């Protein structure tokens, strides 16, 4: 909750490789639905490496529908085909299907050797938030573990769900189903504070290691609709990104 008592959601991405770093968030207004969405896209023309992983690293991460907001880390937000077969998604399928059922259609990400979990947040007009995850059972067991948990929303702290055992990308230890005796284990408490979506966005961005943070987005529910801030990106242009990369590897 914001300091004024309004629900908020935020989403942040990080990355270690140049391909993961060379991304940006963009806010779009959907003329067909009359609602906003946040897209994760390439900063400039996608590289060959990015093209190979496009379905994993480029996606709509935040969408709203009839007062409910869906936040996920992949195509499970609103895509209805996975590996050439039908798959349910949160934007059009949640309600008719549970979060676990939707993530079960997708499983964890096929990005060996990490096999990053797929995660999701669903927040409606009530005081509860739903978190869900699909993770590889273990390094030696390729079955998919799915779980979901409902968490009361309060004004004392922000709760989030992480794909990694630690908050920061540098630790690179994705959750495995065998680790999750209770789904609370992959929930994290964030020191996020603010009144408006811009303050929430900035607070979320600052919560991540500055070496790895890529972009952050946030929205606040004002009692009628979800109000989005323009996303905060580490790089505002391809030229800035390339200059930053050059500083890492001086000639």
Where are these regions (language model features)?
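Conserved short alpha-helical segments that host acidic/polar catalytic motifs at enzyme active sites
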Residues: 1-251
